[in-house]
Amino acid sequence: MTQRALVAGGGGFIGGHLAAELLGTGVDVTVADIKPEDQWYQRHPRARNLVLDLEDPAACQEALAEADVVYNLACNMGGMGFIENNRALCMNSVLINTNLLKQAQQQGVQKYFYASSACIYPDYRQGETDLVALKESDAYPAMPEDGYGWEKLFSERLCRHYLEDFGMQVRVFRFHNVYGPFGTWDGGREKAPAAICRKIIEAERNGSYEIEVWGD
């Protein structure tokens, strides 16, 4: 039987690559994203493409109509510049994961993947230069540096509780600075690797010998 997957946030950078990979392995893919289709990073004609606001439970129900596995990469986010200036907006993404989990459980979906972030780690652990490699348990005691990190950490816990209470097969992955083909490189939503590459190219074109780098 052909697997049927929902890629929530599939119009975004990582979601677009995931949808392409799933389609390439013969999976029947539904892509749901809030952006108009002409703003999707990649659009796959073989997928069932839906423009939906997944903060709405009814939209989640529609997106899940033909799915038996969920990949949730949907959220309102960007680079640190975007996160710092849109803290409340980033927190709204908790509605997406809450509604998707609830609807998935009610519709009998057993497999659920949640895209978390390294932003869940405490602020003080990100300011120490002599720190050893982070472990999963280093997320606690919890003190993420911003609303985006708190939203991700809460959503991780919610996923865990759905595993404990309903037996759903839940997996969580904490992404860091992701970049590559089709990635954002300007406009404030880009991550550090892409932003630094852009600044270097712009500096060379402008004859400048300096670029601005955030953090220390």
Stretch-by-stretch model annotation:
Residues 1-76:
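N-terminal Rossmann/SDR dinucleotide-binding element
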Residues 4, 28, 110-111, 169:
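Residues at the starts of beta-strands that form the adenosine-phosphate
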Residues 54-93, 103-106, 123-124:
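NAD(P)H-binding glycine-rich loop region in Rossmannoid oxidoreductase-like domains
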Residues 124-133, 157-216:
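NAD(P)-dependent short-chain dehydrogenase/reductase
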